Amino acid sequence: MKVYYDKDADLSLIKGKKVTIVGYGSQGHAHAQNLNDSGVKVTVAVRKGGASWDKAKAAGLKVEEIAKAVKTADLVMILLPDENIPQVYKEEVEPNIKKGATLAFAHGFNVHYNQVVPREDLDVIMVAPKGPGHTVRSEYLRGGGVPSLIAVYQDKSGKAKDIALSYAAANGGTKGGVIETNFKEETETDLFGEQAVLCGGAVELVKMGFETLTEAGYAPEMAYFECLHELKLIVDLMYEGGIANMNYSISNNAEYGEYVTGPEVINAQSREAMRNALKRIQTGEYAKMFIQEGKTNYPSMTARRRLNAEHPIEQVGGQLRDMMPWIKAKALVDKSKN
């Protein structure tokens, strides 16, 4: 698999274009500020009078309403929540985007599942940093970059891949390395990772571990430290050098326990559940579920958010984190700024 770096990208391509970033959330604020700092002519497109409008203005960026900003753009990057993109594309982007312009996304969901059907005269690309927007921005400011994916869905100009690489470079991606994929692969693997491992799997594993200890009479504080707080220490070791690096760094007792108990907890039944999750993603069943959830104003998700917020692990966690001010000092998320 080829990895692209700074030397493989022509930054002048994106610097010669007017770029409109639709949205100023987690990814939007990072892309807009990074491209602006790289010398790209950037306009942020958001609803006038909203919090995002004020935040983008405060960051020194040019801000316009969506339809107006799209009309003058050579490249339009849509960085809105997946559920909001189809309507915004249909009502404000498609009628206004110039013929022969480039339409860009950071996730393939809507194109892959036909919620957005791009006009045939457009280049359609994806530039997807493999990290949250706050990290995309902080790594750029540090002089580095978050590894990114690029993909081409439509190549009307014959230069879509070069444009994607140039955009990725301006966003810092070619500092970390850029890998080419396609919309199908990015969408399906991204959803699977989120659902089975990173969010769904990890959250349920942590909560179940916490509940098992507290139900057996152990102090909630001890359960929090052992099942949530220390997870970062282990994940950082794996992130740094893989599973073998983590095992090299932990005690023999911890490593032996991993081999004895790990396969009992995450077992053949877990593998079958993962395969079922992947099948839902591949067939489009999950996409239909998510789209329908949005159409009914997210009743299931709202209920689950409330239950999670009320879980004892949240209560004890807040108290313990207050004892560790260095965590807040290094926080990735500042809700007042992004």
From Swiss-Prot:
<feature type="domain" description="KARI N-terminal Rossmann">
    <location>
        <begin position="1"/>
        <end position="181"/>
    </location>
</feature>
<comment type="pathway">
    <text>Amino-acid biosynthesis; L-isoleucine biosynthesis; L-isoleucine from 2-oxobutanoate: step 2/4.</text>
</comment>
<comment type="similarity">
    <text>Belongs to the ketol-acid reductoisomerase family.</text>
</comment>
<dbReference type="InterPro" id="IPR000506">
    <property type="entry name" value="KARI_C"/>
</dbReference>
<keyword id="KW-0100">Branched-chain amino acid biosynthesis</keyword>
<feature type="binding site">
    <location>
        <position position="226"/>
    </location>
    <ligand>
        <name>Mg(2+) 2</name>
    </ligand>
</feature>
<feature type="binding site">
    <location>
        <position position="194"/>
    </location>
    <ligand>
        <name>Mg(2+) 1</name>
    </ligand>
</feature>
<feature type="binding site">
    <location>
        <begin position="24"/>
        <end position="27"/>
    </location>
    <ligand>
        <name>NADP(+)</name>
    </ligand>
</feature>
<feature type="binding site">
    <location>
        <position position="133"/>
    </location>
    <ligand>
        <name>NADP(+)</name>
    </ligand>
</feature>
<feature type="binding site">
    <location>
        <position position="190"/>
    </location>
    <ligand>
        <name>Mg(2+) 2</name>
    </ligand>
</feature>
<protein>
    <recommendedName>
        <fullName>Ketol-acid reductoisomerase (NADP(+))</fullName>
        <ecNumber>1.1.1.86</ecNumber>
    </recommendedName>
</protein>
<feature type="binding site">
    <location>
        <position position="251"/>
    </location>
    <ligand>
        <name>substrate</name>
    </ligand>
</feature>
<comment type="function">
    <text>Involved in the biosynthesis of branched-chain amino acids (BCAA). Catalyzes an alkyl-migration followed by a ketol-acid reduction of (S)-2-acetolactate (S2AL) to yield (R)-2,3-dihydroxy-isovalerate. In the isomerase reaction, S2AL is rearranged via a Mg-dependent methyl migration to produce 3-hydroxy-3-methyl-2-ketobutyrate (HMKB). In the reductase reaction, this 2-ketoacid undergoes a metal-dependent reduction by NADPH to yield (R)-2,3-dihydroxy-isovalerate.</text>
</comment>
<feature type="binding site">
    <location>
        <position position="230"/>
    </location>
    <ligand>
        <name>Mg(2+) 2</name>
    </ligand>
</feature>
<dbReference type="Pfam" id="PF07991">
    <property type="entry name" value="KARI_N"/>
</dbReference>
<dbReference type="GO" id="GO:0050661">
    <property type="term" value="F:NADP binding"/>
</dbReference>
<dbReference type="InterPro" id="IPR008927">
    <property type="entry name" value="6-PGluconate_DH-like_C_sf"/>
</dbReference>
<feature type="active site">
    <location>
        <position position="107"/>
    </location>
</feature>
<dbReference type="InterPro" id="IPR013023">
    <property type="entry name" value="KARI"/>
</dbReference>
<feature type="binding site">
    <location>
        <position position="190"/>
    </location>
    <ligand>
        <name>Mg(2+) 1</name>
    </ligand>
</feature>
<keyword id="KW-0028">Amino-acid biosynthesis</keyword>
<keyword id="KW-0521">NADP</keyword>
<dbReference type="Pfam" id="PF01450">
    <property type="entry name" value="KARI_C"/>
</dbReference>
<dbReference type="InterPro" id="IPR036291">
    <property type="entry name" value="NAD(P)-bd_dom_sf"/>
</dbReference>
<feature type="binding site">
    <location>
        <position position="47"/>
    </location>
    <ligand>
        <name>NADP(+)</name>
    </ligand>
</feature>
<keyword id="KW-0460">Magnesium</keyword>
<dbReference type="GO" id="GO:0009097">
    <property type="term" value="P:isoleucine biosynthetic process"/>
</dbReference>
<dbReference type="InterPro" id="IPR014359">
    <property type="entry name" value="KARI_prok"/>
</dbReference>
<comment type="pathway">
    <text>Amino-acid biosynthesis; L-valine biosynthesis; L-valine from pyruvate: step 2/4.</text>
</comment>
<feature type="domain" description="KARI C-terminal knotted">
    <location>
        <begin position="182"/>
        <end position="327"/>
    </location>
</feature>
<dbReference type="GO" id="GO:0000287">
    <property type="term" value="F:magnesium ion binding"/>
</dbReference>
<keyword id="KW-0560">Oxidoreductase</keyword>
<feature type="binding site">
    <location>
        <position position="52"/>
    </location>
    <ligand>
        <name>NADP(+)</name>
    </ligand>
</feature>
<keyword id="KW-0479">Metal-binding</keyword>
<dbReference type="InterPro" id="IPR013116">
    <property type="entry name" value="KARI_N"/>
</dbReference>
<dbReference type="GO" id="GO:0005829">
    <property type="term" value="C:cytosol"/>
</dbReference>
<dbReference type="GO" id="GO:0004455">
    <property type="term" value="F:ketol-acid reductoisomerase activity"/>
</dbReference>
<dbReference type="GO" id="GO:0009099">
    <property type="term" value="P:L-valine biosynthetic process"/>
</dbReference>
